[in-house]
């Protein structure tokens, strides 16, 4: 058993993972992204300065931490270079801190074109993707036709492979979706201009991480999105295209599951969701507006307004089961300050009157579900910026305790603000 830690979302993403990863990397040697792509949006606030990362791991701001983009991530060269440039302009030496797996599938312009064309064609049934080509890139990976970072080592062979795959996708874009084709030469020129930069950061990630664990060096795995968006276990088809759950760590990084010792589930004190899909506890009243405005619930990646609602314990329990959670970090507790009453969903009532305490698997099976709530007194005192559990209002402590009782998982960390210092650590994941 290793002391390595996984940090992942337990809801529909946007739980506040970036801040917690940044906070905990003080103890880590490596921080690894193992799934997703630049559809993630991890916001960090350090000494009042805000940083939003979409692709590069949140550990990049730490001087002695090595950040790794592993094989489970679909990599947009354009997005990576943009993010690297922004960080380097702030004096952060990204190229000496960042490593890539040669097995990362590349996101190229035809993936983005397909993503947007499909969403437009779906009309009202659109999934609500970020339009960044994530799904189509994973499709090419599974179909074994995708280009990977490692293909850039042989530029002549890459050019031929690119020509063939662009012809394949352009046929669909032009003849089915009736949109403009992707330009082969421009795509080739753009990727060749940065090919040496990408290949210069390539390492054997699986071997590196294995040797690191043998030396006792600590690794943190940074999840993107959330458990309920998992391609297999989420509200299908309103899901992302990767395994956002703890099982994705081994396949997405090449390090075996025995080398994970603690799984930290990030749980927002209420629920949010971006885009379409089931959301039983969604609020359409002034309380929902209150949570959205006070919580600044607007996507870091898309800027879209997030749907808001009460904490859904039934959905959280599913995340506990799937991920073997060791503990929770509860974020945005301060957003609930000032509410006279707070609620948590403890059951679902089906249209036929039956009450269930587990989440359905397919999105259609959520149709007509009504949440069953348990109410608790709210609190007027501010929890914002509190750094000591003893200073939290009793009603807030009761809320935390009730979540622990209903899920069977301890709340080991409480986040009371966006800055890394605004945190109460009750049990450190690396010491658990």
Curated annotation (Swiss-Prot):
GO molecular function, one term: adenylosuccinate synthase activity
Cofactor: Mg(2+)
SMART domains, A to Z: Adenylsucc_synt
UniProt cross-references to Pfam families, sorted A to Z: Adenylsucc_synt
Catalytic activity as recorded in UniProt: IMP + L-aspartate + GTP = N(6)-(1,2-dicarboxyethyl)-AMP + GDP + phosphate + 2 H(+)
Positions contributing to IMP binding: 14-17, 39-42, 130, 144, 225, 240, 304
Annotated compartments: Cytoplasm
Positions of substrate binding: 300-306
EC identifiers of the protein: 6.3.4.4
GO cellular component: cytoplasm
Catalytic residues identified in the record: 14, 42
Keyword Cell inner membrane among UniProt keywords: no
Record-listed GTP binding positions: 13-19, 41-43, 306, 332-334, 415-417
Protein's GO biological process: 'de novo' AMP biosynthetic process; IMP metabolic process
Binding site for Mg(2+): 14, 41
Enzyme class: ligase
InterPro entries listed in its UniProt record: Adenylosuccin_syn_GTP-bd, Adenylosuccin_syn_Lys_AS, Adenylosuccinate_synth_dom1, Adenylosuccinate_synth_dom2, Adenylosuccinate_synth_dom3, Adenylosuccinate_synthetase, P-loop_NTPase
Assembly behavior: Homodimer.
Protein family according to the UniProt entry: Belongs to the adenylosuccinate synthetase family.
Function description: Plays an important role in the de novo pathway of purine nucleotide biosynthesis. Catalyzes the first committed step in the biosynthesis of AMP from IMP.
HAMAP family registered for this protein in UniProt: Adenylosucc_synth
Protein name: Adenylosuccinate synthetase
Organism per entry: Proteus mirabilis (strain HI4320)
Classification lineage: Bacteria, Pseudomonadati, Pseudomonadota, Gammaproteobacteria, Enterobacterales
């Amino acid at each position: 058993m290793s002391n390595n830690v996984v940090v992942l979302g337990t809801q529909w993403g946007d739980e506040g993972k970036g801040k917690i990863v940044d906070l905990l990397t003080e103890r880590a040697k490596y921080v690894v992204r193992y799934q997703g792509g630049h559809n993630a949006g991890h916001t960090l606030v350090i000494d009042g300065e805000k940083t939003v990362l979409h692709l590069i791991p949140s550990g990049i701001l730490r001087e002695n931490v090595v950040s790794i983009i592993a094989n489970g991530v679909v990599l947009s060269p354009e997005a990576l270079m943009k993010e690297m440039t922004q960080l380097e302009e702030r004096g952060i030496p990204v190229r000496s801190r960042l490593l890539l797996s040669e097995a990362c599938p590349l996101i190229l312009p035809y993936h983005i074109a397909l993503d947007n064309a499909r969403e437009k064609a779906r009309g009202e049934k659109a999934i609500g993707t970020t339009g960044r080509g994530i799904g189509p890139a994973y499709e090419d990976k599974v179909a074994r036709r995708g280009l990977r970072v490692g293909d850039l080592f042989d530029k002549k062979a890459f050019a031929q492979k690119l020509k063939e795959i662009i012809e394949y996708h352009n046929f669909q874009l032009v003849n089915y979706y009736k949109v403009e084709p992707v330009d082969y030469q421009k795509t080739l020129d753009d990727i060749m201009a940065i090919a040496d930069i990408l290949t210069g950061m390539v390492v054997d990630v699986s071997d590196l991480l294995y040797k690191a664990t043998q030396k006792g060096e600590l690794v943190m795995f940074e999840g993107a999105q959330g458990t309920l968006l998992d391609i297999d276990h989420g509200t299908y088809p309103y899901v992302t295209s990767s395994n956002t759950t703890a099982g994705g760590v081994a396949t997405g990084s090449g390090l075996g599951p025995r080398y994970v010792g603690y799984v930290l589930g990030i749980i927002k004190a209420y629920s949010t969701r971006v885009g379409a899909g089931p959301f039983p506890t969604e609020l359409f009243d002034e309380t929902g507006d209150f949570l959205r405005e006070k919580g600044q619930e607007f996507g870091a990646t898309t800027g879209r307004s997030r749907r808001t609602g009460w904490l859904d314990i039934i959905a959280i329990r599913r995340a506990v089961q799937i991920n073997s959670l060791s503990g929770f970090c509860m974020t945005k507790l301060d957003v609930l300050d000032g509410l006279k009453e707070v609620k948590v969903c403890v059951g679902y009532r089906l249209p036929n009157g039956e009450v269930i305490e587990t989440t359905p698997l397919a999105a259609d099976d959520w149709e007509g579900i009504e949440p069953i709530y348990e109410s608790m007194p709210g609190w007027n005192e501010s929890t914002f910026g509190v750094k000591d559990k003893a200073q939290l209002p009793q009603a807030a402590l009761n809320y935390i305790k009730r979540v622990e009782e209903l899920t069977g998982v301890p709340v080991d960390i409480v986040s009371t603000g966006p800055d890394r210092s605004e945190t109460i650590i009750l049990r450190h994941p690396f010491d658990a």
